[in-house]
């Protein structure tokens, strides 16, 4: 099972679209993140897993592989959590995969499943606009910054 979602990375003072690809397969159960990732992004593995569990989602024991691209741009911070969670939910059939092509997601997940504010929202939202996304989902506390 495959799905994809989108977020944005900060590259200098600009943003760039981050493509979140998720594959669900047979194998040793677990969640693996791959890409050019900071430690905060690698820690998303646990934040997302626990946030989804505490939000009431249950999944069969499967191997979940998540690739964050482009590979040549370092992904920093916690703003990818929401997009990773959405991609997992889509891969398991909870969310329509087609609608995700129109949305860029920004936000950190708390262990309780709540969406937390993040830094650098404005250049990320502008990146969504520049790249033709119809919607950009941001944390409530970042709405004023998002414009």
Predicted regions, residues:
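Peripheral, non-AAA+ core regions of ATP-driven protein-machinery
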Residues: 1-147
């Amino acid at each position: 099972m495959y799905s994809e979602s989108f977020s944005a990375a900060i590259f200098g003072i600009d943003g760039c679209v981050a493509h979140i690809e998720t594959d669900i397969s047979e194998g040793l159960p677990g969640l693996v993140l791959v890409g050019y990732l900071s430690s905060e992004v690698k820690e998303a593995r646990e934040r997302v897993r626990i946030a989804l569990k505490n939000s009431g989602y249950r999944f069969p024991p499967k191997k979940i592989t998540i690739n964050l691209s482009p590979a040549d741009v370092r992904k920093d911070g916690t703003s990818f959590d929401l997009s990773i969670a959405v991609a997992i939910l889509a891969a398991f059939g909870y969310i329509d995969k087609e609608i995700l092509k129109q949305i860029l997601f920004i936000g950190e997940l708390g262990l309780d499943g709540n969406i937390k504010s993040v830094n650098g929202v404005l250049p990320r939202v502008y990146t969504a606009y520049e790249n033709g996304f119809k919607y950009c989902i941001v944390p409530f506390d970042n709405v004023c910054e998002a414009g």
